[in-house]
Amino acid sequence: ILIGYKDKKWKYNVTACSSSYSLGDMITVGLTTDSNAVDNIKEYGEFTVNVPCQQILSKVEIAGFHSGQNKIGMADMTYDPAKYIDAPIMDECILSLECKVESTSEYGKYTNFVASIKRRVVCENLLDEEGNMKYIQFNPIYFMGDDNKRVYRYFNEASKNHGENMGCSSDEDEYNPLCG
């Protein structure tokens, strides 16, 4: 993901982040403590989470390097100001979240921000006519790695409905005791 934030030197900036999870209206992101992003997010208490697709991977990599530089300019990215916080919503991304920091914790060389989600912005072509997410078309970048190797993975079109691996059906007439 790309974390957008207010930057005291460059107005707005971004950094790449591979550590996050969300539950309901809360999200946690983890970043290296000794970074420009952490310094600015601690100061301003706000950030955006922007989910890129594989078509902009070169821009994501620029955002993952060059700490303290104008990475939005270096990657030739565009943005709109967020509606409820002072941080950038990256135009090239397929999903964005406006986040307000609720707590910060440091563990070793990492800082974790727990934030409340104030607004969600989803690319219109990912929504059906009722405003529901078209998950099959959601194609984010998945970054994984360790000290040995780091790689990018991508989602494909294969999917299964929740419960399908246990033999559960969405057909209400079929009863399976495993499905509850």
List PLM regions with ranges:
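Basic, polyanion-binding surface patches
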Residues: 1-180
